[in-house]
Amino acid sequence: MLLVLAGASGFLGTAWRDHLAREGHEVVRLVRGEALSANESSWDPYAGRVDPEVIERADVVACLSGAPLAHWPWTESYKKTFVDSRVATTRTLAEAVAASDRKPAFLAQGGVAGYGDRGDTLLTEDAPTDADTFMGSVVRAWEAATEPAAAAGARVVVMRTSVVLDRRGGPVKLLLPVFKLGLGGPVGSGRQYFSTISLRDWLRAATFLAGREESRGAYNLSGPDSTTSADFGRVFGRRVHRPAVVPVPAFVLTTLAGTVSSELLNSTRVEPARLLAEGFTFEHPTVDDRLAAALHQDPSSTGH
């Protein structure tokens, strides 16, 4: 499989690129600067420019581009950057796929914020994504940007990705020193549902969807169990041999998401219904499995 990948230098992009190479697939990275090797191709998503020959050769085009959520300060200017870095990049690639003769499959990153604060309601891919929040509006615009490819008849997959757990990036990297100091615990009340997936399972799920011709539409990339913030904090604390009773400090939330940090307190109980129905199996089905993998521990142990 030849996969053309935007966002290949980020946390998920770097890991997926390495995973695909180990699985025997070829990856061409889209880069904003000059292409320095045969497996790179220059593009300018904001000008709508991408090499049509690269798209024509691809079996799959994938977009993981996006400015990081963990940023401070969250100014109005950064909010625009956050949105454009997702929507404009996705739309440019969707239009390139639509304009191609071969019509490669198109995989686009997305999120679960569109579901909003839904308490203990189990959220499959059929649940409404009408959350009246900043992040909800971002996710809807992000998914809508794939429409040119779908309208042209290409196979389009939107990966509604929950929180990916690994110590090399994302919230685990930020929370680990907090928990090691004994300052970790639930976020907010602890009663809200907090959907997560291990990095390994995300990589496997993305590769599964890229290679499966029957897969199209939106998929929840989240672990199959339902975990509250309190459960997550308790397991995290046990994994690092520290108490986990103190609510996560506000500065951690602000560092994670700036002025939209309050949205991290939403309860979003996501179920990967379509992945499970199509036969995907999780290597890390529980939050304990996922945190053991994220911390590079033996899952049968209780910590280091």
Task: Identify the meaning behind each predicted range.
Residues 35, 39-89:
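NAD(P)H-binding glycine-rich loop region in Rossmannoid oxidoreductase-like domains
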Residues 90-132:
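Conserved Rossmann-fold NAD(P)-dependent oxidoreductase catalytic core, especially the SDR/UDP-sugar
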Residues 262-304:
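C-terminal amphipathic/interface module of NAD(P)-dependent oxidoreductases
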Residues 3-23:
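N-terminal Rossmann NAD(P)H-binding glycine-rich loop of SDR-like oxidoreductase domains
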Residues 140, 152-154, 165-174, 209-219:
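Glycine/proline-rich active-site loop of Rossmann-fold NAD(P)-dependent oxidoreductases
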Residues 131-156:
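Active-site Tyr-X1-5-Lys
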